Amino acid sequence: MLHSSALRRLGAKTQVMNPDTDDFVRTRLTHSLEVAQVGREVGRMLGCDPDVVDTACLSHDLGHPPFGHNGERALNKIAAHMGGFEGNAQTLRLLTRLEPKVIAEHDVSAGLNLTRASLDATCKYPWTRTDAPRRADGTQTHKFGIYEDDLPVFEWFREGARDAGVESQRKCLEAQVMDLADDISYSVHDVEDAVFGGHVQLEQLREAKHRQAVFDMTRQWYLPAATAEQLDAALSRLETLNRWVPCMTGSRASLAQFKGLTSKLIGRFAWSLSLIHI
């Protein structure tokens, strides 16, 4: 995985902030390397094979096009007549067909020829567009991880799970670790890039309008049932950390303090995880 051209290609794709010339913000490539480091440690803590988690984390953004979700929507519109486009499904396509490393029988590409466990761990949405689960309002989620004509390889690497009676649309533990490592990494590092790039200062969160905007976005994307009091309490806990940096001045001291903050937050989120058996 580490030597694949698909992974190197992520170096030309932005994460959130546009790269500058004198201080480099994260690209999809550097983000994936950081996700792999977080995922490997979390996976080891939870009893996963760290190499499998590492592979999944390095792979998690391979299929995502330039220009982020806007690029994904544009490609989905263009490909609507042939089943659409989805970055996660494209990741599986790259790993099993498009990345030219192993040619199987009848001159058919086997992609990187990864193990079942590795492919299963990369599968964030283990369903096709047709079989996508429904939300509470009855509408289907637009996310899917399998193109219809990639179903044979999906059924191959999920064969053992199916035989064991595992729910067909449940992600394996390694895939859940990959997903969490991604969330932990971007939730901290994207803010770091925004601060280092001069786009925002953490002290702005003291202002009611900015604080409310963060709460509204959190409810829209992640926690629709959360109250303003709960969100305010969570943010206040972060603001009381001894490494919290209200204002980045650009001095060596503030740079070091902010790096300490990001390390502390990554560790805080990673070590708070635990297994829930259902």
Regions from the PLM with identified roles:
Residues M1-T30:
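Glycine/alanine-rich phosphate-binding loops at beta-alpha junctions
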Residues L2-R8, A12, Q37, M45, ...:
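Sequence-structural signature of the catalytic-core scaffold of metal-dependent phosphohydrolases
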Residues T21-V52, G165:
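Alpha-helical phosphate/pyrophosphate-handling elements in metalloenzyme active cores
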